[in-house]
Amino acid sequence: MKREEAEVAVVGGGVIGASLAYGLVNRNPSVLLIDKENMELTASRGNFGLVWVQGKGFGMPRYADWSIEATEHWPEFASRLEEESGISLDYEKTGGLEICLGTQEFEERKNFLGQMQEQSKDGTYPCEMLSRSDLQSKLPDIVLGDEVSGASYCPHDGFVNPLALLKALHW
């Protein structure tokens, strides 16, 4: 093991640790990323790659705001990381749906989003409820099951290839 010196050490080379190190190295070139040798069995390799706002930060308004702000920075971040690493992240900001089954689940989701809106600093929250017919209009090629009552939709939601992201952060 060779000894390294740095002003900042980040322990953990998964998506979170590697992202922190990536951000820090742009401010301070003396950053050391410490991780185990085998990256095969990590949570970062098994995640879904969701860049998601919906439902994050309930009871924690600042976290909810950060989630929204973070998704607003994703296109620029993904573009810059792809350019620097030469690795396509397959990032897409498609918007996201949370499907509701039955009237009760639809009403619970609607109330939840209302609470998220109430806790926000400006009284807004970037998600909306879609009726079953509105949802069907968004998904014209999909036959909705009888229990589907609608969905919540957030235009900020999207996804990234988590394996490509991890590889690009480690380039």
PLM feature segments, named:
Residues 1-5:
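A short, basic/flexible loop-to-alpha-helix module at the beginning of a structural domain
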Residues 6-33:
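N-terminal Rossmann-like FAD-binding beta1-loop-alpha1 element of flavoenzymes
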Residues 23, 76, 111, 168-171:
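Alpha-helical scaffold segments in soluble metabolic enzymes
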Residues 25-47:
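Glycine-rich FAD pyrophosphate-binding loop
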Residues 37-39, 135, 169:
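Short beta-to-alpha linker loops that shape the active-site pocket of alpha/beta-hydrolase fold enzymes
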Residues 40, 137-145:
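FAD-binding beta-loop-beta segment adjacent to the flavin cofactor pocket
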Residues 49-138:
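Dinucleotide-binding Rossmann-like beta1-alpha1 core, especially the glycine-rich loop
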Residues 152-171:
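Helical element adjacent to the flavin cofactor pocket in flavoenzyme catalytic cores
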